[in-house]
Amino acid sequence: MKPLAIPANHGVMGQQEKHSLPADFTKLHLTDSLHPQVTHVSSSHSGCSITSDSGSSSLSDIYQATESEAGDMDLSGLPETAVDSEDDDDEEDIERASDPLMSRDIVRDCLEKDPIDRTDDDIEQLLEFMHQLPAFANMTMSVRRELCAVMVFAVVERAGTIVLNDGEELDSWSVILNGSVEVTYPDGKAEILCMGNSFGVSPTMDKEYMKGVMRTKVDDCQFVCIAQQDYCRILNQVEKNMQKVEEEGEIVMVKEHRELDRTGTRKGHIVIKGTSERLTMHLVEEHSVVDPTFIEDFLLTYRTFLSSPMEVGKKLLEWFNDPSLRDKVTRVVLLWVNNHFNDFEGDPAMTRFLEEFENNLEREKMGGHLRLLNIACAAKAKRRLMTLTKPSREAPLPFILLGGSEKGFGIFVDSVDSGSKATEAGLKRGDQILEVNGQNFENIQLSKAMEILRNNTHLSITVKTNLFVFKELLTRLSEEKRNGAPHLPKIGDIKKASRYSIPDLAVDVEQVIGLEKVNKKSKANTVGGRNKLKKILDKTRISILPQKPYNDIGIGQSQDDSIVGLRQTKHIPTALPVSGTLSSSNPDLLQSHHRILDFSTTPDLPDQVLRVFKADQQSRYIMISKDTTAKEVVIQAIREFAVTATPDQYSLCEVSVTPEGVIKQRRLPDQLSKLADRIQLSGRYYLKNNMETETLCSDEDAQELLRESQISLLQLSTVEVATQLSMRNFELFRNIEPTEYIDDLFKLKSKTSCANLKKFEEVINQETFWVASEILRETNQLKRMKIIKHFIKIALHCRECKNFNSMFAIISGLNLAPVARLRTTWEKLPNKYEKLFQDLQDLFDPSRNMAKYRNVLNSQNLQPPIIPLFPVIKKDLTFLHEGNDSKVDGLVNFEKLRMIAKEIRHVGRMASVNMDPALMFRTRKKKWRSLGSLSQGSTNATVLDVAQTGGHKKRVRRSSFLNAKKLYEDAQMARKVKQYLSNLELEMDEESLQTLSLQCEPATNTLPKNPGDKKPVKSETSPVAPRAGSQQKAQAQPPPPQPQPQHKINQGLQVPAVSLYPSRKKVPVKDLPPFGINSPQALKKILSLSEEGSLERHKKQAEDTISNASSQLSSPPTSPQSSPRKGYTLAPSGTVDNFSDSGHSEISSRSSIVSNSSFDSVPVSLHEERRQRHSVSIVETNLGVGRMERRTMMEPDQYSLGSYAPMAESRGLYATATVISSPSTEELSQDQGDRASLDAADSGRGSWTSCSSGSHDNIQTIQHQRSWETLPFGHTHFDYSGDPAGLWASSSHMDQIMFSDHSTKYNRQNQSRESLEQAQSRASWASSTGYWGEDSEGDTGTIKRRGGKDVSIEAESSSVTSVTTEETKPVPMPAHVAVTSSTAKGLIVRKEGRYREPPPTPPGYIGIPITDFPEGHSHPARKPPDYNVALQRSRMVARPTDTAAPSPIQQPHGHPASGRPVNKPQWHKPNECDPRLAPYQSQGFSTEEDEDEQVSAV
């Protein structure tokens, strides 16, 4: 019997833990908002300031919220500074851009429902969430679905609670959803189970008993439990549902019977596993309603188990000869070409297969299918660029051309000489020539095209396979030969084509595309024809295309019904002759019409503006379209300038100025198009008289041009920068082939080497370092602040563009240690932008597997195009791959491949738009500008409106086009942004960035005030400079005592209890299965435990509701490091930031930076005080226990993190603790300090930067990291010897560090460089150098400078008794305790409600003591780790950290450390004075009556 069914600690588990372990802190964002939150506030709220009842991300809600609630959001109690009032062009957009994309935490809602009440949709939501957990690995989907239907949700509020006792009877199988538990075995060994692990019974009804004692290690542990009876029934039922297919006595395929809903209408058998041959054969077998995506899944994933695609191709050609299989074979080939045309391009064998298959279709007279095949080929073919050289102009061309605008076609290759260079370059019959040497060939006469090709010896040719139109051309030519007269098609004829069959519709579309440009006269008809076609397509979209290709396909559905067309199939009219060959899961076959229409040709509307000059420097604005040629521009310019000459006498010239000041002038060919895109910033178009040799551009004009071409970031519109970033990112994202994900995931060799994927992967690092480079190269502090503000705005607009990738990269760049340490720069940032920045970070809160980001991404209101966060995609795919076996019992595990294919399809849909992304992103920007009011309509719906309704698009655009000059200026701005982005010089070396950072703001040294307390002055490499450095003066540092024994490491290994969902109902005990029936209390264990804190949670429900309202309303921290808000910190703010996040930051726990879990560092007595008092200020002095004075006011956001600092125990570097002042008397007993820290969204400022493909674990640190976290990463070059104060004390900004009991045998003086290196080596993807340290303005606990002035404490204003260094007496303190501060006062009082708060410590994070690392181990490199390395580092380390009661801790005053109760976390132990405070009796507590003041005890 297996008492504990604990899955092996698979590598993937570490991954998953990395993402999901931290509890969800959305509930904890405390605010000053007076607007009550809706009661169903979910954990997925982005924490921003505005929440709409519907949870909708549409901006219509946001607009209203902005006008009502947010109207005072940015202004209440916050005096404007000069920077705040800057009137930028897009300043007004910020309000709207800052509004959050909210969504409910659907998973939590589903879990809290009674299993009987769960709907099919609820089960699908749970299925989607659970399938990523290691406990469910290798289970079939039906088993998972059944388990999701019966699972019960349970929460254990407090750390240290016994869940199961040794010998207790087990009666359920449970999976940890959040937090971690420790099992202590009778022999003393301990094992830690983390998120995704399971424990409990095995699938049998035999009695099983617990071995060992299981305790929760962190607060807010969440579990789902399945009763033993249900678990046994479901797992044993699997065999009954299995259908095994045997051949010659061997099992070749296994199918499973599934029911996808409770109606019984959708049930059947689905392939689970099989041999490669049998899976291939299944392509042409009947597929049940529950397995509609088998063909798509197979075609995407066959490459993982077949060596060559021709193994499938040969079978298909063979089966085509069987009339009964012919239609099915054709459907497979159509889907293959449509979905993965790259399998055919560039592969001669597959190209021959395609040609043979076309011949077979022609032979069998399957014209409709053939047409569809050609459409798919044309739609999916990629543009190819090839370069040909000729020995001389007279040399013959190695190919023959057909077509030309005179026939209504483009230029096509009819034949290519075999063995020629053109053949080697890849030119082949049926290719359409799109461009030669920059000249557009899509609308050109054949004779002119031949002339251009002959007159150039160097040919740069852009071609694209377009067999369909090529065959139309051949048909037309043969008709002309028969009839003797050329036929010029009329585009208007399309209106006669009211047929809705797919092939005919496709023909019409292609006619528009291929024939629209018959001649110049027909251009107007072309536009009209396109509009008519669009109307037809719009009318038929109901029957052919999904109305919302992204939305209706069921985001929340399981893989079984993913986008398989269960809803759409019934809409396809029976009249379609080829309905059997189409899968509605791949509407691309039909969307390709749109794509060809919108991407291959551009609207002929004059949507661009040229500024054309004459020699006398007069200029006119000329409206053109993308395809307008230089000759046409000359004609318009002559008309505009009222010149009375013929167009032949003039030409268009481009004059440009090189950076050296050389003026270049060239005449443009008459047929040159895309003129607006070609002009450089340092160039102008001139109308030149061919008969004159006048100087077009004088030297003065040239100098002006040169000046205009020199641009800096601050000159650029933030909206335009975000637009261009989004366009660039989307183009890269859209070009990723689905097969590249598979090749990359399974490490397969491919022709392209996943080139597109790698490019998209690199972008996030490039953009991250761009941010840092731009900020650190600016030497002027005010400009630096403005650049930071500029980037925050850009990130906000990226969110509007749904460009989460760039948004994340920018936040990462601002969090890079060299940027984060710029304390004085960040202090100048206006308060409004602090809030906006915190909101941005909040969206990427890593808790519960990025729940907020995922909920936003899956929001029903979020329509493509979306640019998702790539590291999350990579992480999800990696988890699916590594969490499931590729082969089971010698058979291919197709269930795994199906899940991976579903995920890739889901990602691909984000790029499935029916319009040019450039047009789409620009439409949003123009709409803002042209409509004036920013609060009309929903921006999220803008894309959809524009994409689906041509009229709306035209209307919006025309409103912008009325002013040619304005349009030109917008286009000029876009050109500036493009040039700026293309010429970026990135500094990718973090060492260099750190050097630049130190040049911007040199590190300051800590000089002791008292002569007797002199300590070695630390060099400027002190890793963390608390942010308050400028306001605090160094205080005396007592001589450190002898190093203390390391045995006190377990002193308080508990994270404060955090009630993540304070306003949520608890599941009644009676409704849940018990963990053990023989427990001492004879209670149903976990469920009853989860009830213990419910009373207190309910008491504070109202306040929590308010506090959840938004982080925008809650005065987020100014700088990258967050600081205590209205609560008072026991430890110096610097240290608080630096370590208090220990549990909540990814690095400290997952990456296992040397923290020993989040210790319960706040003494019991403090907790009790916190319960009774609203705000506590504890000023640490060298004299003794801090005295807490009660503050009389009640403010919901007065939480500061208590008890997160204690990593000092293991680090021996720092011990800190903050006391959280809470709005309710009972609140902290459950919520503990975690809630307090939530607003520390900046805490992510730390190390979540260079996010390459492997950075799925990186995302964790986004919100919860501080400068201190990076401390251990990159500073191996620091010399710690001889510094009693150690790393942290060395900075002049060092704040006081509070608890001596956490000291380890490493005193500060002994903190060796190795210890940092060891920590560094554990770091995950965070900014891999630790520049958080160096002077890092790690002290977010400090006050912001207002208007350039330090907000120091005035005794008169704050009634706080500050303890100055003169008053302090040296008291023996642990070596790691440094009492330093950069202000003369012991307290810093901040007014106006700008509160910083120490970062949160995620429950469930288990840090690793520095002593666990071997000496001398160091990080191999400073670059972000390789993906696999990061994966390995993300694992949780099982240690018996909590098992034994802590040994007494040597206190300076001899007080023993309080031990931890077995069943009750120390945090909650009331009315007991904690001796740990004894050494720090404070002389300086005072009450504050002014509710606008904030005091940080430092």
UniProtKB/Swiss-Prot annotation:
<feature type="compositionally biased region" description="Acidic residues">
    <location>
        <begin position="83"/>
        <end position="94"/>
    </location>
</feature>
<dbReference type="GO" id="GO:0005886">
    <property type="term" value="C:plasma membrane"/>
</dbReference>
<dbReference type="GO" id="GO:2000481">
    <property type="term" value="P:positive regulation of cAMP-dependent protein kinase activity"/>
</dbReference>
<feature type="modified residue" description="Phosphoserine">
    <location>
        <position position="1119"/>
    </location>
</feature>
<feature type="modified residue" description="Phosphoserine">
    <location>
        <position position="1022"/>
    </location>
</feature>
<feature type="modified residue" description="Phosphoserine">
    <location>
        <position position="1175"/>
    </location>
</feature>
<feature type="compositionally biased region" description="Polar residues">
    <location>
        <begin position="1306"/>
        <end position="1330"/>
    </location>
</feature>
<keyword id="KW-1003">Cell membrane</keyword>
<keyword id="KW-0217">Developmental protein</keyword>
<dbReference type="GO" id="GO:0030165">
    <property type="term" value="F:PDZ domain binding"/>
</dbReference>
<dbReference type="GO" id="GO:0032991">
    <property type="term" value="C:protein-containing complex"/>
</dbReference>
<feature type="modified residue" description="Phosphoserine">
    <location>
        <position position="1115"/>
    </location>
</feature>
<feature type="modified residue" description="Phosphothreonine">
    <location>
        <position position="644"/>
    </location>
</feature>
<feature type="compositionally biased region" description="Low complexity">
    <location>
        <begin position="1354"/>
        <end position="1365"/>
    </location>
</feature>
<dbReference type="GO" id="GO:0050699">
    <property type="term" value="F:WW domain binding"/>
</dbReference>
<dbReference type="GO" id="GO:0021591">
    <property type="term" value="P:ventricular system development"/>
</dbReference>
<dbReference type="Pfam" id="PF00617">
    <property type="entry name" value="RasGEF"/>
</dbReference>
<feature type="modified residue" description="Phosphoserine">
    <location>
        <position position="501"/>
    </location>
</feature>
<feature type="compositionally biased region" description="Acidic residues">
    <location>
        <begin position="1487"/>
        <end position="1498"/>
    </location>
</feature>
<feature type="modified residue" description="Phosphoserine">
    <location>
        <position position="1079"/>
    </location>
</feature>
<dbReference type="GO" id="GO:2000670">
    <property type="term" value="P:positive regulation of dendritic cell apoptotic process"/>
</dbReference>
<keyword id="KW-0597">Phosphoprotein</keyword>
<keyword id="KW-0963">Cytoplasm</keyword>
<dbReference type="GO" id="GO:0043547">
    <property type="term" value="P:positive regulation of GTPase activity"/>
</dbReference>
<dbReference type="GO" id="GO:0021884">
    <property type="term" value="P:forebrain neuron development"/>
</dbReference>
<keyword id="KW-0967">Endosome</keyword>
<feature type="compositionally biased region" description="Low complexity">
    <location>
        <begin position="1140"/>
        <end position="1159"/>
    </location>
</feature>
<dbReference type="GO" id="GO:0045202">
    <property type="term" value="C:synapse"/>
</dbReference>
<dbReference type="GO" id="GO:0005911">
    <property type="term" value="C:cell-cell junction"/>
</dbReference>
<keyword id="KW-0221">Differentiation</keyword>
<dbReference type="GO" id="GO:0043005">
    <property type="term" value="C:neuron projection"/>
</dbReference>
<feature type="region of interest" description="Disordered">
    <location>
        <begin position="40"/>
        <end position="59"/>
    </location>
</feature>
<dbReference type="GO" id="GO:0043025">
    <property type="term" value="C:neuronal cell body"/>
</dbReference>
<feature type="modified residue" description="Phosphoserine">
    <location>
        <position position="933"/>
    </location>
</feature>
<dbReference type="GO" id="GO:0048022">
    <property type="term" value="P:negative regulation of melanin biosynthetic process"/>
</dbReference>
<dbReference type="GO" id="GO:0050774">
    <property type="term" value="P:negative regulation of dendrite morphogenesis"/>
</dbReference>
<dbReference type="GO" id="GO:2001214">
    <property type="term" value="P:positive regulation of vasculogenesis"/>
</dbReference>
<dbReference type="GO" id="GO:0010976">
    <property type="term" value="P:positive regulation of neuron projection development"/>
</dbReference>
<dbReference type="GO" id="GO:0031547">
    <property type="term" value="P:brain-derived neurotrophic factor receptor signaling pathway"/>
</dbReference>
<feature type="domain" description="PDZ">
    <location>
        <begin position="385"/>
        <end position="468"/>
    </location>
</feature>
<protein>
    <recommendedName>
        <fullName>Rap guanine nucleotide exchange factor 2</fullName>
    </recommendedName>
</protein>
<dbReference type="GO" id="GO:0005096">
    <property type="term" value="F:GTPase activator activity"/>
</dbReference>
